[in-house]
Amino acid sequence: MTTTEEAPKSPLFEAIDKNDTEAALALLKTKEQAAQRDPSGMSVLAAAAYRGNLTLVEKAIELKCDVNDKTDGTLYTPLMFAALSGKQDVCRLLMDSGARMYLVNGIGKTASELAAFVGHHECVAIINNHITIDVIEDLLRPKVNGKYEGAEEYPDELAVFIHSLCGSHEIHPVKIIFRFSKYPDSLKYKKKILYVIDRVFEKQLRCKESNEIMSLKLWLILFSMRETSKFVESNKEKSPEEASLQYAKLISTWQEGDETRRALDVMLRNAVASFPYKHSLLHDTLQKALQKSQIGERPSAYEYIVQALFGQRIAAVCQFCSVCGHPGAKKRCTQCKLAYCSQECQKFDWPIHKKVCSFLKTRQEVSPTDETAMSLDDIQAQIAKIDV
């Protein structure tokens, strides 16, 4: 934002611009101070979000700054500035505090669209897939006249665990299984976990601002949780952690001659096929896209799903872990260059990977822009019409 000599910025805004957190906090102690605007019309919260300063954003929200305030002239909101700064934690905090993702600026762009334009694809995913923990709490412990009257008490950790599933943009089945295995009470509270996820899922297409992308994402998570729970319950001789990790290895198997993990491919295709809202435009176009490749061939079902949910651009610029699908995988097999996000995933996959490493080394990676292999123009054109 530019200013004129006749209208200099206040010391508070000067401190925010310099990212001098200590100085800014000393000048930001009252609601009156938090209500200031700089000469361009930017609020204190917007300026802090633009600088990606989480501490100052927290303080401004504490002092009751409007998280949906629009900067004079440009109509930019704090969430839009956070999206431009690329600060994922600031985006998440603003949305947890009530920032609305559907607001548009002076040129009709949402925060998500601005983040995508400047290449902050993790912020795009966070904004488009946000669910507050309050939503989980309300379903886990519904209150009557402000008081929970349920027969069973649930630990706070359960709400945090369910929120970590619903609020994340990571939908890979193995990632879901890893989370299941690390939460000690996954099986104990299985029914409640599945119930809450199912209720959040159902709300996505039954509200005023229906969200097809969120609906499909939650369905994939719910499907993985159900399948994992079934497997763990059918292997009672093992601990829930052991059984769930065995299931993860089962769906991660890779046979020589296949370009993808066949069992995982089948599972994801079944998940998409079983999506209950068949009238969904997103579901219909994704189903058609999946028919373009055979099971075990590239592009995999996961590649199609990622592009459908998060856009073709994020799939092109992010390297996904070959085990859990985590974006930004930086580790590589020295021989075949298969990507991993961590030593944990690499170690987990080694008994499987060592059998196909030589085969994968001889395979040339299929280009995602190869029209004969993967052309998602149709699905992207349809997704572009969906208001998300």
Curated annotation (Swiss-Prot):
> ANK repeats at which positions?
40-69, 74-103, 107-137
**ZnF (MYND-type) residues:** 321-357
- Ligand binding (Zn(2+) 1): C321, C324, C341, C345
Q: Which Gene3D superfamilies match?
A: 6.10.140.2220, Ankyrin repeat-containing domain (1.25.40.20)
Gene Ontology cellular-component annotations? non-motile cilium
Q: In which tissues is it expressed?
A: Expressed in many ciliated sensory neurons.
Residues noted as binding Zn(2+) 2 in the record, renumbered to the chain: C333, C336, H353, C357
Return the SUPFAM superfamilies for the record. Ankyrin repeat, HIT/MYND zinc finger-like
What is the consequence of disrupting this locus?
Fails to localize guanylate cyclase gcy-12 to sensory cilia.
Question: Localized where?
Answer: Cell projection, Cilium
Alphabetically sorted, this entry's keywords are: ANK repeat, Cell projection, Cilium, Metal-binding, Repeat, Zinc, Zinc-finger
**GO BP of this protein:** chemosensory behavior; dauer exit; microvillus assembly; negative regulation of dauer larval development; positive regulation of cGMP-mediated signaling; protein localization to microvillus membrane; protein localization to non-motile cilium; receptor localization to non-motile cilium
What broad class describes the main subcellular location of this protein?
A: other
Cite the GO molecular-function annotations of the record.
Answer: zinc ion binding
Record PANTHER family: ANKYRIN REPEAT AND MYND DOMAIN-CONTAINING PROTEIN 2
**What is this protein's function?**
May be involved in the trafficking and dendritic transport of signaling proteins, such as the receptor-type guanylate cyclases gcy-12 and daf-11, to the cilia. In ciliated sensory neurons, required for the calcium flux to the cytoplasm in response to onset and removal of a nitric oxide (NO) stimulus and is thereby required for the behavioral avoidance response to NO-producing organisms like P.aeruginosa.
Please state what the protein is called. Answer: Dauer abnormal formation protein 25
Task: Say which species the protein is native to.
Answer: Caenorhabditis elegans
Q: Gene name on record?
A: daf-25
